[in-house]
Design a protein with these regions (language model features):
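Conserved strand-helix element at the start of the C-terminal RecA-like helicase core
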Residues: 231
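Coupling/switch segment of ABC-type P-loop NTPase heads
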Residues: 1-65, 87-89, 95-97
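Switch/communication elements of ASCE P-loop NTPase nucleotide-binding domains
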Residues: 46, 50-69, 73, 78, ...
């Protein structure tokens, strides 16, 4: 993505990829003048600061592989317009270094789940320090994530968003239900044509299909205690 464009354009002028890149730079507290500075050492130091900040703030929540590290870089790309005029753009590229396998891959070549997780944390981290309380409504988030990554996603919400904001989400996944906090859960059941959908915290009156995610969450929690508990 064009670094100058994402630093200067308004939000409605940027696509999803550009918005994610800008959110990452804002999260890292990046200085635009340093990122585009002609002096190599100054530009390199700012890129390393960005890498450290993003790795610390985002990738610490990806427990499936704690040995990942963000590697942002800025390259120059020559563009030619319709009149044959040439211009040089500073292009931001993001790679992910995997210390476990001793290689790096472009961000776009990682799994859909990883890209979604990374992008969500980058975009929603801006709410952490917002002075205005907001209500975040998420419809079936983290669908493409492994069960462990869904637990990481909940940990991010619990630690970074929930202390200052209200977060509501819908889910059918047992891994998105916290067994120790069932008082927060509401189930939605389609009762009949006359009643329509009913939202309740009374699990005893709910049909088995609706209760399945809760049963799965409690069963997984019980299995974890049986296999992992020191007792």
């Amino acid at each position: 993505v064009d670094i100058t464009r994402i630093l200067t354009a308004s939000t409605d002028q940027l696509d999803e990829q550009e918005l994610t890149a800008r959110a990452l730079l804002m999260l890292a507290g990046a200085e635009g003048d340093y990122l585009t500075n002609a002096e190599y050492e100054r530009r390199k130091r700012e890129l390393e600061n960005v890498a450290n900040a993003i790795t610390t703030d985002v990738l610490k929540y990806w427990s499936q592989n704690p040995e990942l590290r963000v590697m942002p870089d800025i390259t120059q790309k020559t563009m030619t317009d319709n009149r044959g005029q040439h211009s040089v753009l500073d292009e931001l590229k993001i790679r992910i270094w995997d210390n476990r396998h001793q290689l790096s891959l472009p961000f776009d070549e990682h799994s859909t789940g990883f890209r979604w997780f990374f992008s969500f944390l980058a975009a929603f981290s801006e709410f952490e320090y917002s002075d205005d309380p907001v209500v975040l409504l998420l419809d079936e988030p983290a669908l493409g994530l492994h069960g462990r990554a869904q637990a990481d996603f909940l940990r991010f919400i619990q630690e970074r968003l929930a202390p200052n904001h209200q977060v509501l989400y819908t889910t059918h996944s047992p891994f998105m239900v916290q067994p120790g906090k069932l008082e927060r859960v509401r189930v939605v059941e389609d009762k009949s044509q006359d009643l329509g959908c009913v939202i309740t915290s009374d699990f005893a009156t709910t049909d088995p299909d609706t209760l399945f995610p809760l049963q799965g969450a409690l069963g997984y929690d019980l299995a974890q205690h049986l296999f992992i508990s020191p007792h």
